[in-house]
Structure formats: structure tokens, C-alpha cells
Amino acid sequence: MIIPNGDRAVVGSDTIVVKDGEVFGKPKDREDAIRMLKALQGARHSVYTSLSVIIEEKGKVKEYKEVYETYVYVKPMEDSEIINYVDTYNVLDKAGAYAIQSKFAVYIERLDGDYNAIVGLPISRLYDIFKENEIW
């Protein structure tokens, strides 16, 4: 992005889901998505979201590299609920095969951490970085 004063900033963010040491990226197909949700239901898992910001200001570069962990507790789900969710929503582009901001929210018992990081971008922290650098 070009900042009004002519400086530049690049923002990147990505997310993975981890349960019992197994990494759940984006599912490769419908069956993989069902497998992931069956593993995640009825238990706690971690969502890791990275945030990388590079700011060029007057020829100098500032870098911010951070990782956020949020614990998500998913209610027990029936197989029919999992299949319905997978068949109704585009889950193939979501780490762990779910989007917390979709209908899947009804299956969330609670979370400990940053909701926006689970969605994919820790926006509050990004705002702080921009504010600190007088971009916002």
C-alpha cells in the first residue's frame, strides 16, 4: 500500500489450526474437511495467526513479525451437522475447515484470545502498528 506521504507498507497474515500436535491447514477436499471437523469437535484446539508488517519510511525499513495463539473450544457435533456445514459453506479455503464468523459460530463453546486473529487478521494490533508509525 502507498501511504499518503509517499512511504510504503506491506501487510501479510496467515492462519493454521493445531490440535494435539497435528497441523490443520486448508483441507484438500470434502473428505479432508469432514475429517478435520470430526477431530476438532468436542475439544480445544489452538489457532495460530501470524502478522507481518514491513514499513518503508524515508528510505528506512521497519519490520514487525508476530504470532498470536487463540484457544478455541468447539462443542460436540453430530456427523450430520459436520456434513451439513461442509456441504453448505466454502471450507476448502479455511484452515481447520471452518470460518468462525460463519454459521460455525454456533458450535463455538468459548475462545481465549483474539477473535479477529481467528478470522485471519489481528486488526487491533495492526491499527496499533499503523498508529505508532503515523500511518493511521
Language model: regions and residue ranges:
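Anionic-ligand binding patches
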Residues: M1-W136
